[in-house]
Amino acid sequence: MNSAKLIDHTLLKPESTRTQIDQIIDEAKAYHFKSVCVNPTHVKYAAERLADSEVLVCTVIGFPLGASTTATKAFETEDAIQNGADEIDMVINIGALKDGRFDDVQQDIEAVVKAAKGHTVKVIIETVLLDHDEIVKASELTKVAGADFVKTSTGFAGGGATAEDVKLMKDTVGADVEVKASGGVRNLEDFNKMVEAGATRIGASAGVQIMQGLEADSDY
């Protein structure tokens, strides 16, 4: 397993500067991460900087609340793809899920999948705000809507990925949909727990620390 290829090297803080974006791009190139995940305002710049690289550009849609209208999320997606995004991480309508308005949640995801035009779509369900049954339902809706991944968290809701939630999500979606763990994955131990639970992508700002942990392990 090439661990670096499981990592979306992430910087989504609202105060992120161009200098900080340059840093994560340079790190992603050096460690051969799967992608850099940045806010939409940075997509075009990141795509230009990574044009000669295998590192993909990932961005976020309806982020972090998921409370934008479906039409807005679809437009954001189209704009991001036009600017060079390779992968889309969208946030579901969490309130609609809790209301039991499952058709609305599914249609919201489907609109982004359609707007992404074949690009990878990951669906953030914000597990920290959901109970067991809601995690299962959100994962099922992600699968039915045709997305590629179900993802745990934005990192903005006071909690992140747990191995238990990742396993539940993976057990729900089966082989057809992948699971991305994000939020609170800060070191090699966290990384390994998520992978063992079934995650095939890790969103983390600590990608370098994770890789340094792997290098230290291999020294023994």
From Swiss-Prot:
Instruction: Kindly state which reaction or reactions the protein catalyses.
Output: 2-deoxy-D-ribose 5-phosphate = D-glyceraldehyde 3-phosphate + acetaldehyde
Q: Mainly localized where?
A: cytoplasm
**EC number(s) from the headed UniProt entry:** 4.1.2.4
**Source organism, top-level taxon:** Bacteria
Its UniProt pathway annotation is: Carbohydrate degradation; 2-deoxy-D-ribose 1-phosphate degradation; D-glyceraldehyde 3-phosphate and acetaldehyde from 2-deoxy-alpha-D-ribose 1-phosphate: step 2/2
Instruction: Report the GO terms under cellular component.
Output: cytoplasm
Question: Annotated Gene Ontology MF terms?
Answer: deoxyribose-phosphate aldolase activity
GO BP term, example? carbohydrate catabolic process
Q: Where in the cell is it found?
A: Cytoplasm
Q: Where is the active site?
A: 89 (proton donor/acceptor), 151 (schiff-base intermediate with acetaldehyde), 180 (proton donor/acceptor)
- Which Gene3D superfamilies does its entry note? Aldolase class I
What keyword terms does UniProt attach to this protein? Cytoplasm, Lyase, Schiff base
Q: So what does this one do?
A: Catalyzes a reversible aldol reaction between acetaldehyde and D-glyceraldehyde 3-phosphate to generate 2-deoxy-D-ribose 5-phosphate.
Q: Which HAMAP family match?
A: DeoC_type1
Q: Could you say which protein family the record assigns here?
A: Belongs to the DeoC/FbaB aldolase family. DeoC type 1 subfamily.
Q: What is the protein's given name?
A: Deoxyribose-phosphate aldolase 2
Origin organism is Staphylococcus aureus (strain Mu50 / ATCC 700699)
